[in-house]
Amino acid sequence: MSEKTKKTKRLDDLNFFDFDAIKLGIASPEQIMAWSHGEVKKPETINYRTLKPERDGLFCERIFGPTKDYECSCGKYRWVKYKGMQCDRCGVEITEAKVRRERMGHLELAVPVAHVWFLRKNPSRIGIMLDMRITDLERVVYYASYVVVEDCIDSVTGRTDYKKGELLTDVQVREARKKHGSRLKVDIGAPAVKKLLSDIDFDKEIPTLHVQLAETQSELERTKLIRRIKTMEEFKASGNRPEWMILSVLPVIPPDLRPLVPLDGGRFAASDLNDLYRRIINRNNRLKHIESLRAPEVMIYNEKRLLQEAVDALIENGARGKFFIGAGGRPLKSLSDVIKGKHGRFRQNLLGKRVDYSGRSVIVVGPSLKLHQCGLPKLMALELFKPFIIGELMKKEGVTLKAAKKMLERVRPEIWDILEQVTKNHPVMLNRAPTLHRLGIQAFEPVLIEGKAIQLHPLTCAAFNADFDGDQMAVHVPLSLEAQLEARTLMLATNNILSPASGRPIAAPSHDIVMGISFLTKVKLNDFGEGAVFGSMEEALMAYAYGKVSLHARIKVRGITAIKEDGMNEKDLKNVNTWKDYTTVGKIIFNNNLPEGWPYVNGAVGKKELAAIIDECYKSKKYGKYETVQLLDRIMKLGYNYATRSGLSISIADMIVPAAKQKYIDAAKKRIKEIQGQAEAGIITEGERYNKVIDIWTRVTDDVAVEQFKEMKKFEEAPYSGEGQRFNSVFLMADSGARGSRQQVRQLAGMRGLMAKPQKKLTGGQGEIIESPITSNFREGLSVLEYFISTHGGRKGLSDTALKTAEAGYLTRRLIDVAHNLVVMEEDCGTTNGVVVSSLMSGEEVVEPIEERILGRTSLEDVIVKIKKADGKEEEKTIIKEGDSITLEQSKLVKKYGVQNLRIRSVLTCESKNGVCGKCYGVSLVSGNISNVGDSVGIIAAQSIGEPGTQLTLRTFHIGGAASRMLSQSQAVAELGGKVTFKDIKVITNRFDNKICISRNGAIFVEAANGTIKEYKIQYGATLHIADKVTVEKGTLMAEWDPHSIPVLSETEGTARLTDVSEGITLQEERNKVTGVIERKITASRMGKKNPRIVIEGKGGKKVSLPLPVDTILLVENGEDVLAGDILAKIAKASGGTKDITSGLPRIAELFEARKPRNAAIMSEFAGVVSLETSPKGLVEIVVRSEETGQVKQYAVPQGKHLVVYEGDHVGVGEALTDGAIDPHDVLRVKGIKEVQEFLLNAIQEVYRLQGVTINDRHIEVIVRQMLGNVKIVDAGDTPLLKGEIVSRATLLKHNAQAEKEGKKIAVGDPILLGISKASLASDSFISAASFQETTKVLTDAAITGQVDTLQGLKENVIVGHLIPAGTGISAREFTKEFEAAKKK
């Protein structure tokens, strides 16, 4: 027996699962012949009568193997006993039919043809090798021009008349032949290219090219030479030969990979590849035939060209713009099309497979389930657990397989007991599409239920983003024991309480539950039973049960509240309204459901408070996960119970319209009339008028909303009359966070507010706001005009949703691709580098305090604070030690002692060779423990960033396009009293005796008595109301300015002369439609370079030049006398449009793709003083002169750019000199890697924060690390790298280590910022890159360089079918390695 099994195991069978790397190369003709099992000579496929494959055709059994297992074509041999024999009649080997999936054939081409990938794919590899233009190459390959294949030297003069590689037309060849005869060697078509390629000798060529590279001066020539050298060295190193890029033998892929599928009605559905192969065989055979007939050259060339085109079409149809069309007029799918794109091999079959043992059904709510359970319909479970049931039946009943299947089909009663038993401890996985993050698939224990719908626990809805309006979910059964174990320990719903994106609870109560709890814990004055004093909780609950006291009545209970408060007499005890410390029965009921020993919660409990309780419970050492799960289930039951009892319903009377609404609107209209008057008088410009109007309405809308909530709250705080409702339902829902936002309630009963206009804005932004708001609300009803205005907003929301979901999905895909191979690879990399974090500020307010940013991160230093002891002495105390993972308690101490900043470890500075280390990543956000080796932090980061993208795009339409604008700040008011200090403020007095600030980066510092200092930035042109070194009270107005425009001020007395300002060229006069005033605006000159400016000619002949950017509104006439502080012109600021995530999502994509902004700001490369000059071309030039080094740099300012610095200003390193977006590449170049990391992190977080989405910093850090993972070689040293090449940091380190070992000069690289798409394609793994984008290009490159994919990342392992190197897959790998090592010993 053992002998026999050994024989059947064929030695040439590879084990397809046991390999560590994949290498790609170019197949040589010998290699193709070695793969082949025979030549395909005929274009026939199968015989239409017998339906058997034709001999020597595309499905021939002799070449590719038998169509039926162990049966030859003619039927002489059939059965396994003849295995391995070859039939003497039909020549078919007796073997399994599945060899038809792996055996290849070949086609001898009558003439070599060029491989279209190497010829056409940019950059053309054949072109680089021969140093020929792609157009010239095509002329040769497609038989339009001849090429000289050897230098032709004139025998008389010794001159080279025709150089190798030169192109000649038909006529030129005839002429040259007359002169040179047979000395002229020319050829045409792919054979000519093949000859040229085979003549290349790398050992001679490469040194020659290096010499040329050293000598050349031209940058273009350099780039070209570097590319040639690189390609040649790649060829040499990989062992490929250049002539293999020309095919003389064509492989024919196995027939089962291009099948003919019989359809009913005797027709066949054929794979397109068969058509393409047929066309090649036909043309090849015809060419052979014509050649044997000695046909004229023209005919033969034409036929050869057709063969070349046919092979092109097989490899990549449409590569040259011409498609081969199949039946039905669609282009045929070539080999390239089969592998690329969403429906190609990579993405359709290798990365996304269909799964057996799965089902799907509609979901319904299962409020009686525990958190770890789901309701599974019995019929579904019966089908899903079939194999397990059959196994049990065979074991229990002792029946055969067949009988067990019969029993199952008839659904015998004993089967239900077995099903119960089989599903008892067998978790199933539920998944809801789209699976945007890891919580989209969770494991549950099934509870068998009647009916056909799956029951889902309400608290998991947030993670799945599920609701019960007809959503469907899929069920998957983990089969193996390991899979079950992983599902239970890693994926069970009880392990997924925290969101991996923010580390906050995601399984927190919402909607009805919050409503119920909020109702339960509310207080109502004058409710029955008020003023009762109870001896214990139980007594109070009993009184409630007997109906003696209401749920919301104010009561006192011994042990919870103070019975006698300080300074209270007996009379006060009877008067409830004097009580300060009281509780309600509802609050007692709520607190009884909290974990034992939890401090009594006596406030109102809404959504936020509940989430905080869950968070604290989960993260505290005392309670932990198990207790939190119990708590969640108790809160859910309680919430549903009291939501039902509350009898909540909304009536139109609940929507209270604030009484003061009309007063606000009238005041606003009056104010707008005044502004209109100012505009008509020409005091303010049209742009300013518009901005002011919008500002007024935005304020009014907010005021009305505030007023409305006040009135609703009043109703709640009013004493209960004994009948009717106790609370306002609308307010209860919005206030507790159960449903609806302030904005929605405002639209119901306040005023709808401003709406966005459909068309694009003149300034290029979108969402211009209509300046007359909708003053009605939905309760009063909208007028026809108002309704019409709002329709646009509503529709925009819906269409945005559809378009943007795809956009967000694509962003997630790119993020996953760039970060998938980042896994925690070691516990500690031992680095001493890190980043400094402090509280994030936006202007004056703290956006994210330091204690939130450091939570769960590893500290790089001891944090020592000074504490005052009771005796007044100070002592030092260490609150955080170096290397600590900062806990919740420690972060609270940081807040308490006011620590300003802290150095922490970060993924950005982690020094792990591949992947990151646990210490740098910090505590896992999901578990709250330090990250384990194998955590796939890259994927989690990508999901956390991508998932809200989709959510946000889906959220715009709820508000119906109501314009939300940020109110512009226009004054500096002292927030605390203290002493004033001016910094960098130059002041002049204008003709009205006002003090005007004329410095660009001035600031006022106010120092309070306790030493706190507050900084206020003062704008250029601001009016100052205080002097330097005075003391101000809190709330003093210190300065104010116009928020909508920047003035151009005269700083001295003199005469204004307008230079380069000429009507119709750089000045445009237009009459304002609304006000009828004529405005004079500076425009970009179409004719020549003009540089509009005002020159002030002062006393003593001193001249000051003030540049006027485009869109400046001119307020002075030429030759007018001006005084210091006069406003000569105004530059309008573009006002913010509506802040939609629509602008947010493209912004995030722009940052991650590291795109250069359209109008980037010019940055100063060093610190210095600014002076303004005019370049020879007439443009403004900013000159920065360093005071320390004397270094000078000029920056030309393009037309239409606004300056933000002026003559004599001081600028710092990397400070913007003009307006415009900041280009991250500039930040990297000027300020370095740390700054660009911080810039990207803050810019991305800002977009999400605007939408109220919390994402932990480290997810963005992970992606930014990947974006900065490559370097550009500046000096190659003695390494094989080339100057200007972009390689990963790991590659550079590897080459440098090798060079150091050999005592050679190492290479130097500059860090470079790549966008996520580019970074994905620059991945070291070609399998991962090919499955992302540009598949054919990636594969072409990989084949030429003979690239080896060592299968380090997740994606490539999924594709080749290995366990992924993350999580349990890593431990499996380690174990296998150790096992192999032990075996060797």
UniProtKB/Swiss-Prot annotation:
Gene Ontology terms describing biological process: DNA-templated transcription
CDD domains in the cross-refs: RNAP_beta'_C, RNAP_beta'_N
Protein's organism: Elusimicrobium minutum (strain Pei191)
Any one GO CC term of the record: DNA-directed RNA polymerase complex
Gene for this chain: rpoC
NCBIfam families recorded: rpoC_TIGR
Binding site for Mg(2+): D467, D469, D471
Classification via SUPFAM superfamilies: beta and beta-prime subunits of DNA dependent RNA-polymerase
Protein name stated in the entry: DNA-directed RNA polymerase subunit beta'
Binding site for Zn(2+) 1: C72, C74, C87, C90
